[in-house]
């Protein structure tokens, strides 16, 4: 069976490794990115074509995949001059691997559907190293028939591929997951910071908390920095701040509010303003340790 031609926009660390995995598996890829260096790395492996127009890339592809930073960037790529909406063929599919606002995803999906184009939101779990080997966790959502159409491709990109329901459910689930994770890390980091201010030994605090129900991978994650001074970059404060902002907006769109998310978002923004944006989330410990009333 002939493999579909894949258009891929967004060749950052995650996206670049995802494309390398596709190339190793014999896919023809059409790529677009602001970084010529990233594009050149793809072209050097062969079976690849560079595009500078999203419209033209879409017209030359059966499935278009996005691995972009924000909902605003996704909307610009879709709706902008020479955008995907103008170029995607009837029967083709758009897959958004980023973490986006569900309301935006649903709007894009509805506009694509008017052209006979399907859409799947499929935010990712795990790391760029997993992406290179096709071992990601993929939280896909969208029309069941569209999902089944692209599942053979997703199975080559992810070890665990979940179908979570209607379009937008993937992004909703990812934002809920990140809300739980980032609020937990921020809380634990402040706990270590308060202990330091109070003269309580961080290792002893960790030993006590990890012996009870508070023990978790997140606790270990925070301890690496707050106690051991080791920064293991997994997720930046800037990205956490963006995702918490999306979660707050999503909750507001649902007619509710989240005071917990708003408070955590305020702390993350303060850490960004303090110059910690590109550091790992547990480094927010430094912000809390210096925080004065």
What are these regions (language model features)?
Residues 54-66, 70-117:
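Rossmann-fold NAD(P) dinucleotide-binding segment
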Residues 29, 50, 119-120, 161, ...:
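Hydrophobic beta-strand scaffold residues
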Residues 99-178:
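Rossmann-fold dinucleotide-binding core
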């Amino acid at each position: 069976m002939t493999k579909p031609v894949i258009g891929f926009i967004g060749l950052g660390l995650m996206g670049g490794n995802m494309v390398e995995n596709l190339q190793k598996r014999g896919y023809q890829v059409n790529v677009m990115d602001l970084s010529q260096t990233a594009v050149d790395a793809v072209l050097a492996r062969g079976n690849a074509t560079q595009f500078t127009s999203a419209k033209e890339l879409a017209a030359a592809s059966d499935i278009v995949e996005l691995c972009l930073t924000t909902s605003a960037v996704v909307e610009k790529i879709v709706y902008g001059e020479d955008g995907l909406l103008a170029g995607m063929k009837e029967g083709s599919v758009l897959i958004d691997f980023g973490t986006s606002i569900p309301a935006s995803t649903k709007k894009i999906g509805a506009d694509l559907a008017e052209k006979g184009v399907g859409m799947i939101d499929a935010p990712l779990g795990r790391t760029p190293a997993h992406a290179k080997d096709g071992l990601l966790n993929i939280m896909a959502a969208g029309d069941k028939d569209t999902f089944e159409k692209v599942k053979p491709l997703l199975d080559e990109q992810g070890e665990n591929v979940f179908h979570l329901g209607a379009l937008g459910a993937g992004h909703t689930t990812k934002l809920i997951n990140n809300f739980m994770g980032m609020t937990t890390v921020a809380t634990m980091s402040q706990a270590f910071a308060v202990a330091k201010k109070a003269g309580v030994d961080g290792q002893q605090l960790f030993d006590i908390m990890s012996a009870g129900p508070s023990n978790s991978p997140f606790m270990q994650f925070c301890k690496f920095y707050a106690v051991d001074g080791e920064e293991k970059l997994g997720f930046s404060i800037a990205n956490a701040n963006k995702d918490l902002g999306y979660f707050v907006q999503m909750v507001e769109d649902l007619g509710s509010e989240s005071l917990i998310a708003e408070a955590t978002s305020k702390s993350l923004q303060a850490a960004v303003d303090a110059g910690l944006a590109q550091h790992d989330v547990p480094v927010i410990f430094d912000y809390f340790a210096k925080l004065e009333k």
